From Swiss-Prot:
Keyword Ribonucleoprotein set for record: no
Localisation per UniProt entry: Endoplasmic reticulum membrane; Cell membrane; Cytoplasm; Cytoplasm, Cytoskeleton
Species: Rattus norvegicus
Modified residues (N-acetylmethionine): 1
UniProt-recorded name of the protein: PRA1 family protein 3
Gene name of this polypeptide: Arl6ip5
Length: 188
């Protein structure tokens, strides 16, 4: 299946005003996780543009440390995803505690980068855009178009770069299973 980049959402849709933002229910982790995954899929191109601008500014100020940090993060992330697919205990951890999995990757990257120097470049250049994405995805309420796009991604009608990343983190399987359960209940 072809991978398509999601369209760039309008600024008033991406950041519409305080009425479309709400604090997530921290007691219901699955609902919060669903909101984050849905928003990451729907606004992925906007997140990419914001991250690229921030990374470009930091990379312009300190290019060597930025490249070094990027290489280390990609290698650590790839290593953890590979290990999680080959080791059952890591696979269960990644599935049950996705936030902890991402935090372990970030901490491992931090320690490797601190051995080479340039920790602050990593923090501001790579981690800060990720933090902003997570905060926006957590607080932004979903609209009907967002939910429809996510269902199309979930059942395989569309494939996007963020969908591939979330599949690697095994964050879309649950939504596909829920959708399949819904269809089977609707048939009955």
């Amino acid at each position: 299946m072809d991978v398509n980049l999601a369209p760039l959402r309008a600024w008033d849709d991406f950041f519409p005003g305080s009425d479309r933002f709400a604090r997530p229910d921290f007691r219901d982790i699955s609902k919060w996780n669903n909101r984050v995954v849905s928003n990451l899929l729907y606004y992925q191109t906007n997140y990419l543009v914001v991250a690229a601008m921030m990374i470009s500014v930091v990379g312009f100020l300190s290019p060597f440390n930025m490249i070094l940090g990027g290489i280390i993060v990609v290698l650590v992330f790839t290593g953890f995803v590979w290990a999680a697919h080959n080791k059952d205990i890591l696979r269960r951890m990644k599935k049950q505690y996705p936030t902890a999995f991402v935090m372990v990757v970030m901490l491992a990257s931090y320690f490797l980068i601190s051995m080479f120097g340039g920790v602050m470049v990593f923090v501001f250049g790579i981690t800060f855009p990720l933090l902003l994405m997570f905060i926006h995805a957590s607080l932004r309420l979903r609209n009907l178009k967002n939910k429809l796009e996510n269902k199309m991604e979930g059942i395989g009608l569309k494939k996007t770069p963020m969908g591939i990343i979330l599949d690697a983190l095994e964050q879309q399987e649950d939504s596909i299973n829920k959708f399949a359960d819904y269809i089977s209940k609707a048939r009955e």
